[in-house]
């Protein structure tokens, strides 16, 4: 496996492309925002003029797109990925989508004789850029093993979860835990502030306690400083919470904590923080507590 195509060069796509380039892969990238691609060209990325151009001549293609609707169009639309990719190219779907959509893509790929894997990655773009994160994989193990060199170049860990769709289940579960943990941290810091304890001091104390976590290390300083440079944009987490609730509705089950998290993120996005990090949810909790106007 030598040449990789990437469709979608946003925060996460940039991190993935950078990891592959650093490990000696040839990488062709396409994004609807050309400036995203040009920024990586200085590091050796081949600038693709279209999604089809990014796919041409590749051993594997990753799609790293923002919403399920975009994923569906790129994969299943007229002239989409399943129609244009060569039969030998491994097709790897890395976006956060519903398990149902992942299975639809897998079935459509199988009907066309294409090799497909459900490969969402758990971890922020910052973590992935440093070689962290975990890739969850759903699909045939033989295809998984063939693509392992690319997975190993991108992430610190890769887990074969099961058939197509199971990796997307794992990704939604991971995001549920990570998102609610971040909101719980924000709520704790607001409780402390209301009691008169400076957020920085409370964060320092919590960081030395049994509740210390990676979420605390990553998002705690953002909450304390109110500088919300995005590791993952809040609007993307809002989309993911919505996917969790959609899946829960399909299964006929409640997700009460996720429902509250979705509402808090909706309010925070409406207040203008959608393009900032999920940590910005603390601003809504502060407003509700009467700490900030």
For the regions a language model picked out, list residue spans one by one.
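Rossmann-fold dinucleotide-binding core
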Residues: 4, 9, 96-179
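Rossmann-fold NAD(P) dinucleotide-binding segment
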Residues: 51-114
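Interdomain hinge/lid region at the active-site interface
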Residues: 164, 168, 212-277
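Active-site-proximal catalytic alpha-helix in oxidoreductases
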Residues: 131, 135-138, 159, 163-195, ...
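NAD(P)+-binding Rossmann beta1-loop-alpha1 motif at the extreme N-terminus of oxidoreductases
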Residues: 1-64, 89, 94, 125
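Hydrophobic beta-strand scaffold residues
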Residues: 27, 47, 116-117, 158, ...
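NAD(P)-dependent dehydrogenase/reductase Rossmann-like domain
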Residues: 270-293
């Amino acid at each position: 496996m030598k040449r990789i195509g990437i469709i979608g060069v946003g925060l996460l796509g940039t991190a993935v492309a950078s990891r592959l380039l650093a490990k000696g892969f040839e990488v062709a990238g396409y994004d609807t925002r050309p400036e995203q691609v040009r920024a990586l060209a200085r590091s050796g990325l081949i600038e693709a003029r279209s999604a089809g151009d990014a796919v041409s001549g590749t051993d594997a293609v990753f799609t790293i797109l923002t919403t399920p609707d975009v994923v569906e169009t790129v994969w299943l639309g007229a002239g989409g990925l399943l129609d244009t990719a060569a039969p030998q190219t491994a097709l790897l779907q890395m976006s956060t989508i519903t398990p149902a959509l992942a299975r639809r893509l897998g079935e459509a790929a199988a009907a066309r004789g294409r090799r497909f894997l459900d490969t969402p990655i758990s971890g922020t773009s910052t973590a992935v850029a440093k070689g962290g994160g975990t890739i969850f994989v759903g699909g045939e193990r033989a295809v998984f093993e063939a693509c392992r060199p690319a997975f190993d170049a991108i992430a610190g860990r890769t887990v074969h979860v099961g058939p197509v769709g199971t990796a997307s289940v794992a990704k939604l579960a991971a995001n549920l835990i990570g998102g609610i943990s971040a909101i719980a941290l924000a709520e704790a810091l607001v409780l402390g502030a209301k009691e008169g304890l400076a957020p920085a001091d409370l964060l320092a104390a919590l960081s030395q306690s049994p509740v210390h976590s990676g979420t605390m290390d990553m998002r705690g300083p953002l909450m304390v400083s109110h500088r919300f440079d995005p590791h993952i944009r809040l609007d993307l987490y809002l989309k993911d919470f919505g996917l969790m609730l959609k899946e829960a509705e399909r299964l006929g089950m409640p997700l009460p904590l996720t429902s509250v998290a979705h509402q808090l993120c909706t309010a925070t996005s409406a207040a203008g923080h959608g393009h900032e990090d999920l940590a910005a949810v603390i601003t809504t909790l502060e407003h509700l507590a009467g700490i900030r106007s």
